[in-house]
A protein has these predicted regions:
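AMP-binding/adenylate-forming catalytic core of the ANL superfamily
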Residues: 148, 180-187, 192-198, 340, ...
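Structural core segment of the AMP-binding/adenylate-forming
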Residues: 22-50, 54, 137, 158-236, ...
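Conserved AMP-binding A3 loop
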Residues: 117-122, 248, 256-280
Length: 626
């Protein structure tokens, strides 16, 4: 593609809202190619949908649906609490029970040993009631924070719903966190209670527990005969609790969820979400994931990540469908067996997992009967065009990428089932979401750019229900996210003439080289077109003449070994695909690239290690570089 290599026509300065340093934002000129031309140059044609591909889709005519959509109509799809108010857990389970759908399978949990535990909407509601009673009996009240440190265990889902029924605030954490990240998040959140395993507690919490005076109760799963002092055996407490509980009356703007997101530096930010968010969770499930009543849905996201809450718990349950939970870690054969045996119809996963499946090959996927799959979607980081197209080869349909953030609470931009897919694009905004591309002005404001394929910061008009309401106890940090009536996402993007959005990179990831603004995603995608490359991470490193030059880190597919000949071949491949101005000047081989639990390649960590800089917050690091 030539998009990022276009000549720069204008340079402005703005303040980085997180680091408070001056950075340059370069806006692209009219010399950019159109999206279609760029895709054809890469050999990736637009994937045209046939009418039979989206028969019965909830959204069939995007323009008409967007024209008539209102959040008021979306709210009317939910019941609300008897007597007034709104509660996420009530909408997720209780209203289905009251409507006579209690016998429907809500959650199927598959253990590492292939054991199965099924929860209907009625039994899930009763279990959540028991946990709500456990909290209430111990003085945990409305607004108190309840943290969880669990993997994909039934207690996590029961705990989340029971916490919300009690009017308390659910705050999940990655089970892979070490003691310090856990302590930091629970301290910021002023947590009153914690749900975790006995093993996690002994290793990760007990050594510092006395320092967090707000922590009143610790509920342990997988308890031994001799649990640690000042802890509660959750199973025993649940067995003694009533399965009747009247949901605490919460209002739409009452705090419901506290999700932490890490910046490049500094302490974690606690993004506050309210019960009103359920309006967005519900409707985006219908529109972006095309939920229908008989769907079987599998979201593979870690429950410590917001996707694991918004779309791993709330959205499928409010839509009354069946969701699959797998306790085990990734294994290609196991995943395909689950898709086949559980007859999954909608599958929501991450680019990292898709690339790992690609390593196993399309022929491996074809050994399984995956004919029930209707929609495959991806989130976590931009999905490389090659992965989108590989979906057609392996499954007969493309992966549908979408974009959102912890701060937005739900899907904002997506490739809809009934719309053509442009490989590499994020898709189009959800009805009710006003997105734009802006340039930053000298006076601190922003100006919207309407020219197709002009690069700028992706922004959103505030007002959707799942928008974060605050960074907990950090009002100034929160206010910096909003300028001139827009929410600033911190992502650079482009919008084509058809209204599709294209991710370029985080504003602090973009490489400025010899007058060119280079998006790392574009370079990574080009490298991944090569048959030897499994994944790639790209950074800019200082160079006296150009300012920065591109360096790539590459992990190879099975069957390929690092060599100088292969390094030169990849450099030549990239120059041919991207041109000399954008292609990497150096390539380093790695067995693995550092990634977060949500599957994002940690480019800033690659850069810090390359340049000997401080690594900053690495609490979300899952896979280490090697």
């Amino acid at each position: 593609m030539e998009c990022s290599a276009a000549r720069v026509s204008h340079v402005t300065r703005r303040r980085n809202r997180n680091a408070n340093i001056v950075t340059e934002v370069l806006n692209q000129s009219a010399a950019m190619t159109s999206t279609d031309t760029a895709m054809k140059a890469d050999g990736l044609e637009q994937i045209r949908k046939r009418s039979e591909d989206f028969a019965g889709a909830n959204l069939r005519d995007y323009n008409e649906y967007a024209r008539t959509f209102s959040w008021t109509q979306a709210r009317a799809l939910l019941d609300g609490l008897p007597g007034g108010g709104l509660n996420i857990a009530y909408e997720a389970v209780d209203r289905h029970v009251k409507a006579g759908r209690g016998s429907k399978l809500a959650l199927r949990w598959i253990g590492r040993d292939d054991s199965i535990r099924d929860f209907t909407y009625a039994t899930l509601s009763q279990a959540a009631n028991r946990f709500a009673n456990v909290l209430a009996q111990r003085g945990i009240k409305k607004g108190d924070r309840v943290s969880s440190l669990l993997g994909r265990a039934p207690e996590l889902y029961i705990g989340a719903l029971g916490t919300l029924k009690n009017g308390s605030v659910f705050s999940p954490m990655f089970s892979a966190f070490g003691p310090e990240p856990i302590k930091a998040r629970m301290t910021i959140g002023n947590s009153s209670a914690l749900i975790t395993t006995e093993a996690f507690y002994r290793r990760k919490v007990e050594p510092w527990r006395k320092e967090l005076t707000s922590l009143q109760h610790v509920f342990l799963t997988e308890c031994s005969a001799n649990p640690p002092p000042n802890t509660i055996d959750l199973a025993a407490a649940m067995a003694q609790a009533s399965d009747f509980f009247e949901t605490v009356q919460t209002m739409p703007e009452d705090m419901a969820l506290l999700h932490f997101t890490s910046g490049t530096t500094g302490r974690p930010k606690g993004a506050v979400h309210v019960h009103e968010a359920v309006v967005a969770h519900n409707i985006t499930g219908k529109l972006a994931l095309d939920f229908h009543p008989d769907d079987v849905f599998w979201c593979t996201a870690d429950p410590g990540w917001i996707t694991g809450t918004s779309y791993g718990i709330i959205s499928p349950l409010t839509n009354g469908i069946t969701m699959i939970i797998d306790q085990a870690e990734f294994d290609a054969g196991r995943w395909y067996r689950i898709l086949q045996d559980q007859k999954v119809t909608v599958w929501y996963t991450a680019p990292t997992a898709i690339r790992m499946l690609m390593k196993a090959g399309a022929d491996f996927a074809k050994r399984f009967d995956l004919s029930t799959l209707r929609l495959m979607a991806s989130v976590g980081e931009p999905l490389n065009p090659e992965a989108v197209v590989w979906g057609v080869e392996a499954f007969g349909k493309p992966f549908h990428d979408n974009w959102w953030q912890t701060e937005t609470g739900g899907i904002m931009i997506t490739n809809f089932l009934a719309m053509d897919v442009k490989p590499g694009s994020m898709g189009r905004p959800l009805p009710g979401i006003k997105a734009g591309i802006v340039e930053h002005l000298e006076d601190g404001g922003v100006r919207e750019i309407t020219k197709p394929m002009a690069m700028g910061e992706l922004v959103l008009r505030p007002g959707w229900p799942s928008m974060m309401r605050a960074y907990l106890n950090e009002e100034a940090r929160y206010k910096k996210c909003f300028v001139s009536g827009w929410y600033l996402t911190g992502d650079l993007a482009m919008r084509d003439s058809d209204g599709y959005y294209w991710f370029v990179g985080r504003s602090d990831d973009v490489i400025k080289s010899a007058g060119h603004l280079i998006g790392p995603f574009e370079v990574e995608s080009a490298l991944m077109e090569h048959k030897a490359v499994a994944e790639a991470g790209v950074i800019g490193i200082p160079e006296p003449t150009a300012g920065e030059v591109v360096k790539a880190y590459v992990a190879l597919k099975d069957g390929f070994e690092p060599s100088e000949a292969l390094r030169k071949e990849l450099l030549g491949h990239a120059r041919q695909r991207l041109g000399p101005a954008v292609a990497p000047k150096d390539i380093a081989f790695r067995q693995n690239l550092p990634k977060t639990r949500s599957g994002k390649i940690m480019r800033r960590l690659l850069k810090a290690r390359e340049l000997g800089l401080p690594e900053g917050d690495i609490s979300t690091l899952e896979s280490e570089e090697r």
